[in-house]
Amino acid sequence: MFEAVTPLLDEHAELERRLADPAVHADAALARTLGRRYAELGAVVVAHAAWRAAADDAEAARELAAEDAAFAAELPALQRAAEEAGEKLRRLLLPRDPDDSRDVILEIKAGEGGEESALFAGDLLRMYLRYAERHGWVTEVLDANPSDLGGYKDVSVAVKTRGAAAEGVWHRLKYEGGVHRVQRVPVTESQGRVHTSAVGVLVVPEAEEVEVAVDPNDLRVDVFRSSGPGGQSVNTTDSAVRITHLPTGVVATCQNEKSQLQNREQAMRILRARLHALAQEAADAQASAARRSQVRTVDRSERVRTYNYGENRIADHRTGFKAYNLDTVLDGDLDPVIQSAIDADEAAQLAATSV
Protein backbone atom coordinates (compact mmCIF):
# COMPACT_ATOMS: atom_id res chain seq x y z
CA MET A 1 0.00 0.00 0.00
CA PHE A 2 1.18 3.54 -0.82
CA GLU A 3 3.97 2.27 -3.10
CA ALA A 4 4.17 5.80 -4.55
CA VAL A 5 5.71 7.00 -1.28
CA THR A 6 9.04 5.18 -1.72
CA PRO A 7 10.50 7.38 -4.49
CA LEU A 8 9.34 10.48 -2.62
CA LEU A 9 11.13 9.37 0.54
CA ASP A 10 14.27 8.77 -1.53
CA GLU A 11 13.96 12.22 -3.13
CA HIS A 12 13.54 13.82 0.30
CA ALA A 13 16.73 12.15 1.54
CA GLU A 14 18.62 13.27 -1.58
CA LEU A 15 17.41 16.86 -1.16
CA GLU A 16 18.49 16.82 2.47
CA ARG A 17 21.96 15.78 1.33
CA ARG A 18 22.13 18.49 -1.33
CA LEU A 19 20.89 21.24 0.98
CA ALA A 20 23.65 20.34 3.44
CA ASP A 21 26.17 21.33 0.76
CA PRO A 22 27.26 25.00 1.20
CA ALA A 23 27.88 25.24 -2.55
CA VAL A 24 24.15 24.90 -3.21
CA HIS A 25 23.41 28.00 -1.15
CA ALA A 26 25.76 30.06 -3.31
CA ASP A 27 22.95 29.99 -5.88
CA ALA A 28 20.04 31.64 -4.06
CA ALA A 29 17.43 30.72 -6.68
CA LEU A 30 18.50 27.05 -6.68
CA ALA A 31 18.56 26.89 -2.88
CA ARG A 32 15.07 28.41 -2.73
CA THR A 33 13.70 25.93 -5.28
CA LEU A 34 15.26 22.93 -3.52
CA GLY A 35 14.15 24.23 -0.13
CA ARG A 36 10.54 24.51 -1.23
CA ARG A 37 10.53 20.99 -2.67
CA TYR A 38 12.19 19.67 0.50
CA ALA A 39 9.50 21.31 2.64
CA GLU A 40 6.75 19.89 0.40
CA LEU A 41 8.16 16.36 0.64
CA GLY A 42 8.70 16.79 4.38
CA ALA A 43 4.93 16.82 4.84
CA VAL A 44 4.74 13.46 3.02
CA VAL A 45 7.54 12.01 5.16
CA VAL A 46 5.78 13.03 8.39
CA ALA A 47 2.37 11.78 7.19
CA HIS A 48 3.84 8.46 6.06
CA ALA A 49 5.54 7.93 9.43
CA ALA A 50 2.28 8.74 11.23
CA TRP A 51 0.33 6.31 9.05
CA ARG A 52 2.90 3.51 9.55
CA ALA A 53 2.82 4.00 13.32
CA ALA A 54 -1.00 4.06 13.43
CA ALA A 55 -1.28 1.02 11.14
CA ASP A 56 1.26 -0.91 13.25
CA ASP A 57 -0.62 -0.07 16.45
CA ALA A 58 -3.91 -1.23 14.93
CA GLU A 59 -2.34 -4.45 13.64
CA ALA A 60 -0.77 -5.22 17.02
CA ALA A 61 -4.09 -4.65 18.80
CA ARG A 62 -5.86 -6.87 16.26
CA GLU A 63 -3.45 -9.75 16.92
CA LEU A 64 -3.84 -9.42 20.70
CA ALA A 65 -7.60 -8.78 20.75
CA ALA A 66 -8.48 -12.48 20.80
CA GLU A 67 -6.46 -12.98 23.98
CA ASP A 68 -7.04 -9.72 25.84
CA ALA A 69 -10.38 -7.89 26.07
CA ALA A 70 -8.57 -4.60 26.76
CA PHE A 71 -6.97 -4.69 23.30
CA ALA A 72 -10.31 -5.62 21.73
CA ALA A 73 -11.87 -2.51 23.28
CA GLU A 74 -9.09 -0.28 21.90
CA LEU A 75 -9.18 -1.76 18.40
CA PRO A 76 -12.00 0.40 16.86
CA ALA A 77 -10.32 3.66 17.89
CA LEU A 78 -6.92 2.46 16.62
CA GLN A 79 -8.44 1.40 13.30
CA ARG A 80 -10.10 4.81 12.90
CA ALA A 81 -6.79 6.53 13.64
CA ALA A 82 -5.05 4.42 10.99
CA GLU A 83 -7.78 5.20 8.44
CA GLU A 84 -7.57 8.94 9.16
CA ALA A 85 -3.77 8.87 8.87
CA GLY A 86 -4.08 6.99 5.58
CA GLU A 87 -6.58 9.52 4.24
CA LYS A 88 -4.24 12.39 5.10
CA LEU A 89 -1.35 10.65 3.34
CA ARG A 90 -3.55 9.83 0.34
CA ARG A 91 -4.40 13.52 -0.10
CA LEU A 92 -0.71 14.44 0.04
CA LEU A 93 0.00 11.93 -2.73
CA LEU A 94 -2.48 13.49 -5.13
CA PRO A 95 -0.91 15.10 -8.23
CA ARG A 96 0.46 18.39 -7.01
CA ASP A 97 0.04 21.71 -8.71
CA PRO A 98 3.67 22.50 -9.65
CA ASP A 99 3.12 26.13 -8.64
CA ASP A 100 1.75 25.42 -5.14
CA SER A 101 4.92 26.58 -3.38
CA ARG A 102 5.15 29.83 -5.36
CA ASP A 103 4.45 33.41 -4.38
CA VAL A 104 1.78 35.26 -6.34
CA ILE A 105 0.86 38.51 -7.99
CA LEU A 106 -2.76 39.36 -7.24
CA GLU A 107 -4.63 41.86 -9.41
CA ILE A 108 -7.98 43.40 -8.50
CA LYS A 109 -9.96 45.25 -11.17
CA ALA A 110 -13.19 47.20 -10.76
CA GLY A 111 -15.88 46.04 -13.16
CA GLU A 112 -19.62 46.43 -13.43
CA GLY A 113 -20.85 49.06 -10.99
CA GLY A 114 -18.66 52.08 -11.62
CA GLU A 115 -17.46 53.93 -8.51
CA GLU A 116 -19.16 51.41 -6.21
CA SER A 117 -17.21 48.61 -7.87
CA ALA A 118 -13.98 50.56 -7.34
CA LEU A 119 -14.83 51.00 -3.65
CA PHE A 120 -15.43 47.27 -3.30
CA ALA A 121 -12.10 46.62 -5.04
CA GLY A 122 -10.56 48.59 -2.18
CA ASP A 123 -12.46 46.45 0.34
CA LEU A 124 -11.15 43.27 -1.30
CA LEU A 125 -7.61 44.66 -1.27
CA ARG A 126 -7.87 45.27 2.47
CA MET A 127 -9.31 41.76 2.98
CA TYR A 128 -6.38 40.14 1.17
CA LEU A 129 -3.82 42.31 2.98
CA ARG A 130 -5.32 41.31 6.34
CA TYR A 131 -5.41 37.66 5.28
CA ALA A 132 -1.75 37.83 4.29
CA GLU A 133 -0.95 39.42 7.64
CA ARG A 134 -2.64 36.52 9.47
CA HIS A 135 -0.42 34.05 7.58
CA GLY A 136 2.76 36.04 8.12
CA TRP A 137 3.11 36.72 4.39
CA VAL A 138 4.83 39.79 2.98
CA THR A 139 2.85 42.10 0.69
CA GLU A 140 4.01 44.77 -1.73
CA VAL A 141 1.76 47.02 -3.80
CA LEU A 142 3.23 46.96 -7.32
CA ASP A 143 0.78 49.27 -9.06
CA ALA A 144 -2.39 51.12 -8.08
CA ASN A 145 -4.89 53.23 -10.00
CA PRO A 146 -7.10 54.94 -7.39
CA SER A 147 -10.66 56.10 -7.98
CA ASP A 148 -12.18 59.46 -7.06
CA LEU A 149 -13.85 58.22 -3.85
CA GLY A 150 -10.89 56.31 -2.44
CA GLY A 151 -11.36 52.94 -4.10
CA TYR A 152 -9.30 51.38 -6.87
CA LYS A 153 -9.95 51.08 -10.57
CA ASP A 154 -7.22 48.45 -10.50
CA VAL A 155 -4.42 47.45 -8.16
CA SER A 156 -1.66 44.82 -8.29
CA VAL A 157 -0.04 43.30 -5.19
CA ALA A 158 2.83 40.84 -4.76
CA VAL A 159 2.25 38.36 -1.91
CA LYS A 160 5.20 36.33 -0.65
CA THR A 161 5.95 33.76 2.03
CA ARG A 162 8.86 34.22 4.41
CA GLY A 163 11.41 31.60 3.31
CA ALA A 164 10.76 28.15 1.83
CA ALA A 165 7.32 26.64 2.41
CA ALA A 166 5.64 23.46 1.23
CA GLU A 167 2.38 25.33 0.79
CA GLY A 168 3.12 28.72 -0.71
CA VAL A 169 0.77 31.62 -1.33
CA TRP A 170 -0.45 30.13 -4.62
CA HIS A 171 -1.63 26.98 -2.83
CA ARG A 172 -4.36 29.02 -1.14
CA LEU A 173 -4.91 32.18 -3.18
CA LYS A 174 -5.19 30.44 -6.57
CA TYR A 175 -8.86 29.81 -5.80
CA GLU A 176 -9.56 33.56 -5.53
CA GLY A 177 -9.37 34.28 -9.27
CA GLY A 178 -12.69 35.10 -10.91
CA VAL A 179 -15.65 37.43 -10.47
CA HIS A 180 -16.54 38.61 -6.96
CA ARG A 181 -20.04 40.09 -6.63
CA VAL A 182 -21.14 42.52 -3.91
CA GLN A 183 -24.70 43.37 -2.88
CA ARG A 184 -25.05 46.45 -0.68
CA VAL A 185 -26.29 50.05 -0.51
CA PRO A 186 -23.55 52.18 -2.10
CA VAL A 187 -22.33 55.33 -0.38
CA THR A 188 -23.46 57.19 -3.51
CA GLU A 189 -27.05 55.88 -3.21
CA SER A 190 -29.44 58.43 -1.69
CA GLN A 191 -32.58 56.26 -1.80
CA GLY A 192 -31.19 53.36 0.24
CA ARG A 193 -31.50 50.88 -2.62
CA VAL A 194 -29.31 47.78 -2.76
CA HIS A 195 -27.04 47.63 -5.80
CA THR A 196 -25.11 44.69 -7.23
CA SER A 197 -21.57 45.34 -8.44
CA ALA A 198 -18.75 43.12 -9.61
CA VAL A 199 -14.98 43.06 -9.22
CA GLY A 200 -12.55 40.84 -11.11
CA VAL A 201 -9.63 39.16 -9.36
CA LEU A 202 -6.70 37.64 -11.22
CA VAL A 203 -4.08 35.58 -9.37
CA VAL A 204 -0.92 34.39 -11.12
CA PRO A 205 2.13 32.63 -9.65
CA GLU A 206 5.19 34.85 -9.63
CA ALA A 207 7.96 33.52 -11.86
CA GLU A 208 11.69 33.75 -11.25
CA GLU A 209 13.59 35.81 -13.81
CA VAL A 210 15.60 32.75 -14.88
CA GLU A 211 12.40 30.74 -15.48
CA VAL A 212 10.83 33.10 -18.01
CA ALA A 213 13.32 34.22 -20.62
CA VAL A 214 12.15 37.44 -22.24
CA ASP A 215 13.96 38.72 -25.32
CA PRO A 216 14.32 42.52 -25.01
CA ASN A 217 13.68 42.73 -28.75
CA ASP A 218 10.20 41.31 -28.14
CA LEU A 219 9.25 44.22 -25.87
CA ARG A 220 7.74 47.61 -26.60
CA VAL A 221 8.22 50.03 -23.71
CA ASP A 222 6.05 53.15 -23.47
CA VAL A 223 6.49 55.82 -20.82
CA PHE A 224 3.94 58.39 -19.67
CA ARG A 225 3.06 60.55 -16.68
CA SER A 226 1.48 58.89 -13.67
CA SER A 227 -2.15 59.78 -13.00
CA GLY A 228 -4.19 59.85 -9.82
CA PRO A 229 -7.92 60.08 -9.02
CA GLY A 230 -9.84 61.89 -11.74
CA GLY A 231 -7.00 61.42 -14.19
CA GLN A 232 -4.90 64.32 -12.95
CA SER A 233 -1.14 64.05 -13.31
CA VAL A 234 0.69 63.29 -10.08
CA ASN A 235 4.20 63.51 -11.52
CA THR A 236 5.95 66.06 -13.70
CA THR A 237 8.12 63.44 -15.41
CA ASP A 238 7.34 60.43 -17.60
CA SER A 239 7.84 57.89 -14.80
CA ALA A 240 4.96 55.48 -15.53
CA VAL A 241 5.83 52.49 -17.71
CA ARG A 242 3.79 50.24 -19.98
CA ILE A 243 5.53 47.13 -21.36
CA THR A 244 3.99 45.12 -24.20
CA HIS A 245 5.23 41.63 -25.07
CA LEU A 246 4.79 41.76 -28.84
CA PRO A 247 4.63 37.99 -29.60
CA THR A 248 1.73 37.42 -27.17
CA GLY A 249 0.19 40.86 -26.76
CA VAL A 250 0.52 40.59 -22.96
CA VAL A 251 0.73 44.05 -21.35
CA ALA A 252 1.97 45.13 -17.90
CA THR A 253 1.75 48.68 -16.56
CA CYS A 254 3.21 50.27 -13.44
CA GLN A 255 3.01 53.86 -12.21
CA ASN A 256 3.19 53.33 -8.47
CA GLU A 257 6.90 54.09 -7.97
CA LYS A 258 8.54 57.51 -8.22
CA SER A 259 11.18 56.60 -10.77
CA GLN A 260 10.86 55.19 -14.26
CA LEU A 261 13.47 52.52 -13.49
CA GLN A 262 11.55 51.25 -10.46
CA ASN A 263 8.28 51.19 -12.41
CA ARG A 264 9.97 49.28 -15.23
CA GLU A 265 11.29 46.66 -12.78
CA GLN A 266 7.84 46.20 -11.23
CA ALA A 267 6.16 46.02 -14.63
CA MET A 268 8.62 43.32 -15.67
CA ARG A 269 7.72 41.29 -12.56
CA ILE A 270 4.06 41.46 -13.51
CA LEU A 271 4.84 40.66 -17.16
CA ARG A 272 6.93 37.59 -16.27
CA ALA A 273 4.15 36.29 -14.01
CA ARG A 274 1.55 36.75 -16.74
CA LEU A 275 3.75 35.04 -19.34
CA HIS A 276 4.36 32.15 -16.94
CA ALA A 277 0.61 31.80 -16.38
CA LEU A 278 0.00 31.93 -20.14
CA ALA A 279 2.52 29.13 -20.71
CA GLN A 280 0.93 27.05 -17.94
CA GLU A 281 -2.52 27.51 -19.47
CA ALA A 282 -1.17 26.34 -22.83
CA ALA A 283 0.35 23.26 -21.19
CA ASP A 284 -2.94 22.49 -19.44
CA ALA A 285 -4.83 22.86 -22.72
CA GLN A 286 -2.62 20.20 -24.29
CA ALA A 287 -3.09 17.80 -21.39
CA SER A 288 -5.70 15.06 -21.42
CA ALA A 289 -9.20 15.76 -20.16
CA ALA A 290 -8.57 13.46 -17.20
CA ARG A 291 -5.42 15.33 -16.23
CA ARG A 292 -7.15 18.68 -16.51
CA SER A 293 -9.92 17.42 -14.24
CA GLN A 294 -7.28 16.61 -11.63
CA VAL A 295 -5.45 19.93 -11.66
CA ARG A 296 -8.28 22.35 -12.53
CA THR A 297 -11.32 20.92 -10.81
CA VAL A 298 -12.36 24.31 -9.43
CA ASP A 299 -12.71 26.78 -12.31
CA ARG A 300 -10.99 29.99 -11.28
CA SER A 301 -12.36 32.00 -14.22
CA GLU A 302 -16.02 31.73 -13.21
CA ARG A 303 -18.06 33.73 -10.69
CA VAL A 304 -16.43 33.00 -7.37
CA ARG A 305 -18.68 34.30 -4.62
CA THR A 306 -21.21 36.86 -3.46
CA TYR A 307 -20.77 39.26 -0.54
CA ASN A 308 -24.18 40.35 0.80
CA TYR A 309 -23.75 43.18 3.31
CA GLY A 310 -27.40 43.42 4.35
CA GLU A 311 -27.45 39.78 5.49
CA ASN A 312 -23.78 39.75 6.58
CA ARG A 313 -23.58 36.71 4.29
CA ILE A 314 -20.82 35.28 2.14
CA ALA A 315 -21.55 32.51 -0.37
CA ASP A 316 -19.09 30.59 -2.54
CA HIS A 317 -20.84 29.54 -5.74
CA ARG A 318 -18.37 26.77 -6.61
CA THR A 319 -18.41 24.81 -3.37
CA GLY A 320 -21.75 25.71 -1.79
CA PHE A 321 -20.03 27.26 1.24
CA LYS A 322 -22.21 29.79 3.02
CA ALA A 323 -21.68 31.71 6.26
CA TYR A 324 -23.09 34.75 8.03
CA ASN A 325 -19.85 36.31 9.19
CA LEU A 326 -19.05 38.58 6.26
CA ASP A 327 -17.63 41.23 8.60
CA THR A 328 -14.93 38.89 9.92
CA VAL A 329 -14.19 37.50 6.44
CA LEU A 330 -13.57 41.02 5.15
CA ASP A 331 -11.23 41.47 8.11
CA GLY A 332 -9.08 38.62 6.81
CA ASP A 333 -10.79 35.49 8.20
CA LEU A 334 -10.76 33.80 4.78
CA ASP A 335 -9.40 30.37 5.68
CA PRO A 336 -12.76 28.55 6.05
CA VAL A 337 -13.90 29.88 2.67
CA ILE A 338 -10.68 28.97 0.88
CA GLN A 339 -10.50 25.59 2.63
CA SER A 340 -13.90 24.71 1.17
CA ALA A 341 -12.40 25.16 -2.32
CA ILE A 342 -9.31 23.12 -1.44
CA ASP A 343 -11.47 20.32 -0.01
CA ALA A 344 -13.70 20.29 -3.10
CA ASP A 345 -10.66 20.20 -5.37
CA GLU A 346 -9.06 17.31 -3.47
CA ALA A 347 -12.33 15.37 -3.26
CA ALA A 348 -12.74 15.59 -7.03
CA GLN A 349 -9.17 14.41 -7.55
CA LEU A 350 -9.62 11.49 -5.13
CA ALA A 351 -12.74 10.45 -7.03
CA ALA A 352 -10.85 10.56 -10.34
CA THR A 353 -7.65 8.81 -9.26
CA SER A 354 -6.51 5.76 -7.35
CA VAL A 355 -3.68 6.64 -4.96
UniProtKB/Swiss-Prot annotation:
Residues carrying N5-methylglutamine: 232
GO CC field: cytoplasm
InterPro entries on file: PCRF, Pep_chain_release_fac_I, Pep_chain_release_fac_I_sf, Prokaryotic/Mito_RF, RF-1
Keyword Protein biosynthesis: yes
Keyword Protein biosynthesis: yes
PROSITE patterns: RF_PROK_I
Molecular function GO labels: translation release factor activity, codon specific
Post-translational modification: Methylated by PrmC. Methylation increases the termination efficiency of RF1.
Entry-linked Pfam families: PCRF, RF-1
Protein localization: Cytoplasm
Keywords: Cytoplasm, Methylation, Protein biosynthesis
Biological role: Peptide chain release factor 1 directs the termination of translation in response to the peptide chain termination codons UAG and UAA.
Annotated protein name in UniProt: Peptide chain release factor 1
Origin species: Kineococcus radiotolerans (strain ATCC BAA-149 / DSM 14245 / SRS30216)
Gene (UniProt): prfA
